[in-house]
């Protein structure tokens, strides 16, 4: 019988932040420690406050950051070229001044993609509950924080009250065992999981990841997994914090200092599921024989290993899945039985809140050093933040990228989504180190294949999808 006192890591976060239970259906009034907002999902929320003449409850708990619509042109300036983007960013700036909330604007040396900037600044700490107007807020689970995305009306309520009406999720534990083989990454792990359980396999769940694979991964690798957990439907993703996390956070601008650091560490070490905690669902995945993954369709779960081939929908039983596969192949312009390594590309994109960090760029440089991208391929590398960009330049990575023929640009969400200048044309096919491959995600009629950033680099050199293990040496 379950111990009445046993709790999962998710339960501990929710219980410690619950102000009041609202009913018997699992709805609670939840306190939010940190709010991170971008220029795209916040305007209506601020307009609502202004119309009602309300102020923001806790200004110091909020960060405003420009990332979705800003240009990533190599030479940075504060001007937008798109009228809609100009309107959004100017209104963002206006609200920052009106409500006295800190803003990382386009030319701020701390600017970047919100889910990269937050951990650089030490804004995402173990035990926190963090809400943002973006679904990939799950990224912060890599630090033992609970992050989740919210809509515009919720943002307005949160700004005014520091709270949200929240419905509790079910608990899922994903245990990842084995040692990652040569050439595989955290991106391959999460892509394999999404393919295994489906795009809705974790709907209404918070996932806790554990096991040898997680223990061995770097903090930035863990962020990739938590970031893409939302692609299988999860509304939250967790990993218990450990010494790697504490070392990563230590010394960041907003992290606790001195005696407060020691007190924080003592509390953070308690952040783990109880040994006898019961999960609503358990999944085990052995990663010992994992291969690099690619998507072939228009959903993140339509993916397989690079050595595979385009599936035949007619081999599936009649039903919705067969129809989905048929629609995906028609949109992607692919034929059943085609080897993945035969698929030619026109574009290669590396960046995003999933894979735009310094460790990702180091792996890309290993593939590109001494090589050139294929004729006819346009390659773009967008660092996840201005600080990542500076670090990559200091380490000599940027020169490798430029010498290989890639465009080395400024930070922002860029081509992860068609919301700024960086947009594909109809029929363009892109090897992409991002998180979503929906129809039109990178531009109307564009075709996106998700993979690790190193795999993108290899595809850019080859001119087609290819196994990155052919380009790098093992240990």
From Swiss-Prot:
PANTHER family: 3-ISOPROPYLMALATE DEHYDRATASE (PTHR43822:SF9), HOMOACONITASE, MITOCHONDRIAL-RELATED (PTHR43822). [4Fe-4S] cluster binds at residues 353, 413, 416. Belongs to the aconitase/IPM isomerase family. LeuC type 1 subfamily. This is 3-isopropylmalate dehydratase large subunit 1. It comes from the Bacteria. CDD domains: IPMI (cd01583). It comes from Mannheimia succiniciproducens (strain KCTC 0769BP / MBEL55E). Its EC number is 4.2.1.33. Transmembrane segments: none annotated. Coiled coil: none annotated. Pathway: Amino-acid biosynthesis; L-leucine biosynthesis; L-leucine from 3-methyl-2-oxobutanoate: step 2/4. The gene is leuC1. Binds 1 [4Fe-4S] cluster per subunit. It is an enzyme of class 4 (lyase). GO terms for biological process: L-leucine biosynthetic process. Pfam families: Aconitase. It catalyses: (2R,3S)-3-isopropylmalate = (2S)-2-isopropylmalate. GO terms for molecular function: 3-isopropylmalate dehydratase activity; 4 iron, 4 sulfur cluster binding; metal ion binding. Its cofactor is [4Fe-4S] cluster. Catalyzes the isomerization between 2-isopropylmalate and 3-isopropylmalate, via the formation of 2-isopropylmaleate. Heterodimer of LeuC and LeuD.
